[in-house]
Amino acid sequence: MNQDISICVLTENEMGWTEPFELDKVQILDNYYLSAQKSDIAFLKKMDTARLLAGFRTTAGIDTKGVRPYGGWEDSLLGGHCVGHYLTALAQAVKVTGDKELKEKSQTLIAGLEECQKKLGTGFLFGA
């Protein structure tokens, strides 16, 4: 059996090296990408910080008040893993948009993680 495969070999950029830039210096003008950004922000706003913190709180011995973690990875031995990705997404979205609700979510999440870290007393965080 034969199969054709295409390979793309990247060569050095004709413009030379690119320079780093701040996210808030980028302006999205294309409607497709603006729509994608709005969808991403709406998704970030739907995430429940209490559910994201539930595994960390359980591990630290802090009452979750009946709140359960999200399913999938968050309800397994990888629990808490997604929180780092979520914090990165929040930080980037706040940098780009200045959205106060997302900034508040990030502050709530960080405060919750700090509470768990202090309760454990080891400096360690574990969300599973």
Describe the predicted segments one by one.
Residues 1-128:
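Glycan-recognition and catalytic cores of secretory/periplasmic carbohydrate-active enzymes
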